[in-house]
């Protein structure tokens, strides 16, 4: 949906690929970034895309009041990408971040998690399924015209 509004945008679906968490290695990356045994997975490509973008959206589900585990793995693995390259970290943090969070509960944990990803405060749209008469476990939030309208308004605002 967002890609249809923002021309030239790219979608990266975390459920379609794997980013290996840190571990099950000798932490070679602490000595030499290039030695990370997982550097060929999607982590570096995603970070490269974000660093070279004008705006980044994260669409995140809420599991137990926190972003999903994939988001934490993505965050954890970024240390290798940025290690010894402060100019890349600065470029990443300068890219404005926006998030759409499907959540019926706590918002503060998401605000804190997103705070690590940008200089500016991340702009976050919280979509509690119950507000739209839906049950989050069913995954049918986008069948609500009001939810779709709220997402479109969020994406189109300057």
Q: Whereabouts are the PLM-identified features?
A:
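A short, structured active-site edge motif that brings together acidic residues
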Residues: 14-18, 92, 128-131
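Short, charged/polar "capping" segments at the starts of alpha-helices
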Residues: 19, 106-111, 134-137
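Active-site nucleophile elbow and catalytic-triad environment of alpha/beta-hydrolase enzymes
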Residues: 40, 85-87
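Glycine-rich phosphate/pyrophosphate-binding loop and the adjoining helix
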Residues: 114-158
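Extended interfacial segments that mediate partner engagement and assembly in macromolecular machines
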Residues: 61-64, 83-85, 92-93
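Short, intrinsically disordered/low-complexity patches at protein termini
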Residues: 76, 81-82, 89-92, 133-134
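N-terminal beta1-alpha1-beta2 submodule of the flavodoxin-like/Rossmannoid cofactor-binding fold
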Residues: 1-60, 65-80, 142, 146-158
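Short, glycine-/small-residue-rich phosphate/pyrophosphate-handling segment
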Residues: 87-128
């Amino acid at each position: 949906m967002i890609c249809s509004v923002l021309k030239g945008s790219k979608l990266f679906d975390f459920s379609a690929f794997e980013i290996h968490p840190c571990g099950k290695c000798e932490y070679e990356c602490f000595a030499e970034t290039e030695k990370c045994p997982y550097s060929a997975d999607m982590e570096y490509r995603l970070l490269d895309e974000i660093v070279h973008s004008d705006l980044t959206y994260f669409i995140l589900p809420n599991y137990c009041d926190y972003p999903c585990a994939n988001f934490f793995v993505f965050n954890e693995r970024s240390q290798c990408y940025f290690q010894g390259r402060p100019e890349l970290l600065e470029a990443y943090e300068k890219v404005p971040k926006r998030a759409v969070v499907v959540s019926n509960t706590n918002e503060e944990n998401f605000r804190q998690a997103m705070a690590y990803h940008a200089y500016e405060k991340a702009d976050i749209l919280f979509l509690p399924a119950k507000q739209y008469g839906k049950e989050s476990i069913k995954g049918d939030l986008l069948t609500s015209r009001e939810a779709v309208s709220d997402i479109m308004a969020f994406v189109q605002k300057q």
